[in-house]
Design a protein with these regions (language model features):
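Sequence context surrounding c-type heme c attachment/ligation sites in exported
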Residues: 77-80, 95-227
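A cross-family structural signal marking well-folded subdomains
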Residues: 1-131, 142
Length: 229
């Protein structure tokens, strides 16, 4: 069967990674080298994790729900350190279980997804939220008005990324679309621009457009898995 031969990897890259907009992530050079000097070394590992995750999903006839709720991933020592996970040593890739208890699990916890939907120096709740809305849920937003001001690449002093976005999104002509996508992104603010969990707690509580209150990746995953899939 095709799902048990080398073509499975091509399916993982050409279908799954293409669908998630992470194909070719191992060549990504969008991050600020001064802020994230480790990124150039890690991006290949981050991409390999995603490919192996999808290879495993296909080989085991995983469901759409497994995309969100999978409790395992594949790590080597270098990527495990980025994730703050002990017990993985060397270059050999290992299947690691219990990812939900470690604050990750499924595609929402993949560093490729979190990093590709961030800026060079800061996170982007708008990009992350739009990715959930359009890529995972298959919804579509109208194009933003042409005269919308660009957000700064770095967060101004005294503001968090969330506060910056909330200020931007309060503009009346922008609010209608942003209320649909931004809350999904706010729920993922515990992760920095390269998909690493922040050392300090971040407010990830948010209210979706339909009034549902969620908190963090766990709350977002539960909502998507039970209400939207």
């Amino acid at each position: 069967r095709m799902l048990h031969d080398p073509r499975t990897r091509r399916m993982a890259e050409q279908f799954a990674c293409q669908w998630l907009h992470i194909r070719g992530f191992d060549q990504n050079d969008d991050k600020n080298e001064q802020r994230f000097p480790e990124f150039a070394t890690l991006r290949g590992d981050m991409y390999e994790e995603s490919v192996r995750f999808f290879e495993d999903l296909f080989r085991n006839d995983g469901s759409v729900l497994d995309l969100l709720t999978a409790d395992h991933t594949f790590l080597n020592e270098r990527l495990a350190k980025l994730y703050g996970i002990d017990g993985v040593s060397g270059k050999v890739w290992q299947r690691v279980s219990g990812m939900q208890a470690k604050g990750r699990g499924g595609v929402l916890g993949l560093s490729t997804v979190l990093a590709i939907n961030s800026g060079a120096s800061r996170t982007s709740p708008i990009l992350r939220g739009n990715w959930v809305y359009e890529t995972l849920l298959g919804e579509k937003l109208p194009r933003p008005p042409a005269d919308v001001p660009q957000l700064p690449e770095s967060v101004p002093s005294g503001l968090t990324a969330r506060q910056l976005i909330e200020k931007h999104s309060s503009v009346p002509e922008c609010a209608k679309c942003h209320e649909r996508i931004d809350p999904y992104g706010f729920a993922l603010e515990q992760f920095d621009p390269i998909g690493r969990q922040r050392p300090d707690a971040v407010d990830t509580r948010t209210q979706l457009a339909d009034g549902t209150r969620i908190e963090g990746l766990i709350g977002l995953r539960e909502h998507l898995a039970t209400e939207r899939m």
